[in-house]
Amino acid sequence: MSSMLPSISPELARIAPGFRALSINVIAAPVRDAQVGEIALKEACQAVINGQPAWAQAHIDAWNAVFKAFGAKPKRTPCSAEALRKRVLKDGTMAALDPVVDLYNAVSLRYAVPVGGENSAAYCGSPRLVFADGSETFDTLKEGQPVTESPEPGEVIWRDDRGVTCRRWNWRQGVRTRLSASDKTMWFILESLPEMPVDELYAAGNMLTDGLEKMMPGLRFESTLIGV
């Protein structure tokens, strides 16, 4: 199968030594069981309420330190895993949105790991994790209306040849590459720091791919561990 291969700027080792991520490319099949994601999401919410996993706060704290290192304010713009967990701890649950989105949110909650899900077909070139120079463009929504922003110079971003696909490392994904269960090619990135055991990172990846295989039998996927 033809896979997108993301790249990581070596400069990121300065602020996030030991960063590693699981990159998963998927060629989707028709959805046969749309409830897989919603069921996983409910179970993951309960796991968060029960204080699982035991190392979750250490991993979140490590992400907060990395965010501060490139100038972000994690109390205002936290990493995606912390944002999800805060919502669950406040509301006790999380509403279902889309079968695939529900599944990767469940993985993020269950393993306290930032997970990005993207429509591969919307990419122009390969994903790259870099420091922004401030000239890049980012498409998003504000009060329901499409707007274009630019990252701060020195901000960590995911980008492709066209522009930013995710701001502040994993804080907010753009509209252009947004994923849904109807997309034919998908790319997922599970991002970890050393406070998350590597076997737990692989377990998170297995939860995602096992769930996708139940949801859409016949899909194909390829996983690659990357890092700095």
Label the model's feature ranges.
Residues 1-228:
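Charge-biased, low-complexity intrinsically disordered regions
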